[in-house]
Design a protein with these regions (language model features):
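Serine-esterase "nucleophile elbow" of acetyl-processing enzymes
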Residues: 1-48, 52-61
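Alpha-helical cap/lid subdomain in secreted, periplasmic
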Residues: 31, 51-189
């Protein structure tokens, strides 16, 4: 029997800004014939995910949860500790239900590009400054719970030099999605 996966997250899981065929999660699903349930919702925060965790994860009885959260929290000026606490609650809940957990560390953003192409906001700098801290805290969680992870932040750390991978400074275009797919396939292949 093949594994059932739930991918829980925000627009970075959903595939905002690209056709479904170009979304990295859908590429994993079709390339490797995986049973993946994409529970990415545009704009979702870790608090939102916590609220819908029972319905979107536990009630689907997956073997494996891929969880990536934090960007929208930071774009809402929420502290990293709040994000990490929410993610840890979801990790514990999944593990207590015999669900293996993989963590996704969100990619970097390009504040200037986001201000120009997504929407004007004074929170991009806060997000940009705190993504490295979130990355470190998520790596600590992965170590504490012996979890597998994909570090999309390190992949896009020099985001300004990789602006050709972004739709709007936050969301990745088909080329960026393909980079996430190539990185993620090592964990799922």
């Amino acid at each position: 029997m093949k594994n059932k996966y739930v991918f829980l997250g925000d627009s970075l899981i959903f595939g905002y800004g690209v056709k479904p065929k170009d979304n990295w999660v859908n590429k994993l699903k079709t390339t490797y014939d995986l049973d993946i349930h994409n529970k990415g919702i545009n704009g979702s925060t870790s608090t939102d995910m916590l609220v819908r965790f029972q319905k979107d994860v536990i009630n689907l009885y997956p073997n494996i949860l891929f969880l990536m959260a934090g960007t929208n929290d930071l774009l809402s000026n929420r502290p990293v500790t709040s994000i990490v606490n929410n993610i840890e609650v979801m990790i514990k809940d999944a593990l207590s239900n015999n669900i293996e957990v993989y963590i996704g560390i969100p990619p970097n953003i390009i504040p200037e590009m986001a201000n120009e192409l997504f929407m004007r906001s004074d929170t991009y700098d806060y997000c940009n400054e705190n993504l490295p801290l979130l990355r470190n805290e998520l790596l600590n969680l992965c170590t504490s719970y012996s979890l597998k992870y994909i570090d999309f932040y390190s992949l896009t750390e020099n985001a300004k030099e990789l602006s050709n991978l972004y739709v709007d400074g936050i969301h990745l275009n088909p080329q960026g999605q393909n980079l996430l797919f190539k990185t993620a396939k090592k964990l799922f292949n």
